[in-house]
From Swiss-Prot:
Residues 56-76 are mitochondrial intermembrane. Belongs to the cytochrome c oxidase subunit 6c family. Pfam families: COX6C (PF02937). It is a single-pass membrane protein. It is found in: Mitochondrion inner membrane. Gene3D superfamilies: Mitochondrial cytochrome c oxidase subunit VIc/VIIs. Component of the cytochrome c oxidase, the last enzyme in the mitochondrial electron transport chain which drives oxidative phosphorylation. The respiratory chain contains 3 multisubunit complexes succinate dehydrogenase (complex II, CII), ubiquinol-cytochrome c oxidoreductase (cytochrome b-c1 complex, complex III, CIII) and cytochrome c oxidase (complex IV, CIV), that cooperate to transfer electrons derived from NADH and succinate to molecular oxygen, creating an electrochemical gradient over the inner membrane that drives transmembrane transport and the ATP synthase. The keyword Transferase does not apply. This is Cytochrome c oxidase subunit 6C-1. GO terms for biological process: oxidative phosphorylation. It comes from the Eukaryota. Pathway: Energy metabolism; oxidative phosphorylation. The chain crosses the membrane at residues 15-55.
Length: 76
């Protein structure tokens, strides 16, 4: 038996494309994770905060408070 038969041959054909494929798949998985984290960690809470604010918001009350504080000169 020769030592050449025991060692596996190195792959010489297209090693770059296999490496790129692994990195492309990895980048896609990371991208999906970041998108999900942004949606559930930032976008949904912000949307809920805006909805809660406008659900309980009374613009006439704010206007009357600003008018009484003297913010508007033309409104008496």
């Amino acid at each position: 038996m020769s030592s050449g038969a025991l060692l596996p041959k190195p792959q010489m054909h297209d090693p770059l494309s296999k490496r790129l494929w692994v990195h492309i798949v990895g980048a896609f998985i990371v991208d999906l994770g970041v998108a999900a984290a942004h949606k559930f960690g930032a976008a949904k809470p912000r949307k809920k905060a805006y909805a809660d604010f406008y659900r309980n918001h009374d613009p006439m009350k704010d206007f009357d408070e600003m008018r009484k504080a003297g913010v508007f000169r033309s409104v008496k």
